[in-house]
Every structure is written in C-alpha cells, then in structure tokens.
C-alpha cells in the first residue's frame, strides 16, 4: 500500500518509521521477522516483512516499545502486508506476531498451514532452496 503511493501522498497520508507505519490514521502496520530454518545451519533465512494489525494491537505494541516494558505480551494476530513473489500469493496471510525484547523486531509465524511459506517455515528448507530463493530475489531487483 505505502509502496504504491505517490511521494506527495506519502507525505500527507502516511506516518512511517523503521518498524511502524500508519496510513490515513486507519491502517496500522508493524515490521517483523519471519524466520525460515535452513536445514543443517544455525542461521535461518530471514524475511523482514510488514504485518497489518488492528489499532488496539498497534497501540499496545507501541506502548511496549516506547515504555521499554519487561513483560512480553501476545502473541498477536495480523495479516501479512507483503507479496513475496517467490511464493504463491502471500498478501493477507494470517500471521501470528510474537514480541521479542525491546530493540528486537517481533517474530512472525504464518498461520495458514497449507501455504508453501508456512510449510517451509515449519519444516525448514535446504541450503539449495535458500540459494534458489536468494537468487530469484536478486534477479528480480534488476
């Protein structure tokens, strides 16, 4: 949504930071990390993604981050706000949001078990698959 706005629209309709976004004072987004385990590796493949959330969730998470609270809340529910072109359509996939200590982006988990991304997140991917995804992404950006 934000990416499709003209610059003038962004300046008047959107308030965006590195981890939060509000559009038209009615649409609320949080940024999180979706980790896909790479089999045989300690490091996962990490997607930095936006999730749309209800205003109440946005406000509670904002308070948590702003006040530096120790107690983690959630998990929260949201909807993926990105289309990952290397997968079948991901826009609006149900997502679970788990807060991490302040200063760390929330972890995201896809809630629709039949989707390829959810299956890969649950079972992990081979190094070859991780390289394939990375290669597809690099070639798309050109």
Q: Which residue stretches match the model-derived regions?
A:
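Basic, glycine-/proline-tolerant helical and adjacent loop/strand elements
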Residues: 1-39
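Context-gated lysine
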Residues: 6-7, 13, 31, 54, ...
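Intrinsic-disorder/low-complexity loop/linker signature
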Residues: 25-26, 42, 63, 112
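Long, charge-rich C-terminal accessory regions
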Residues: 32, 39-84
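C-terminal, charged low-complexity interaction regions
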Residues: 64-142
